[in-house]
Amino acid sequence: MAIDNDTDFKAALGKLSVAQQRQLAAGFTNNVMGLCQDVRVAGAVSAAKRPDITDIELAALYQAAKSASIDSYAQCGQDTEWSAQAGHFVAKAAMACVASAADSTNLAWDAAMDARMARTCATIATGEGTANREADAQYQLLEQHQNR
């Protein structure tokens, strides 16, 4: 089934196991990693891809990604530095990747939305406006996952 809207996208993500959601969340976040150079964020996304990740690792990585999110938010400034804002949303997407299953009902959806926000901020920063193809790329990634 081709997914071409957010209602179907969110519903399909919600049917996945937490492990599957974590894998997709990492994929969604990986697509925007070029917008954030923070090693804490990269480490969280990389670790989220591991099927054997422990709850202790998840908690530590969540705190690291949260610290990166707070640091990047502080860099945005009063005038909204859009590139820094993009990095902030990448860090938030990474937080979703390593969030406790009890803290989120749909990890992949949360990461997808933050990744879209990151891409939107980046396109504003470069003067391209708010149109981008991040949602379409996410729909395709989910379809690929479903077809395995």
Where are these regions (language model features)?
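Structured binding/interaction patches within domain cores
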Residues: 1-148
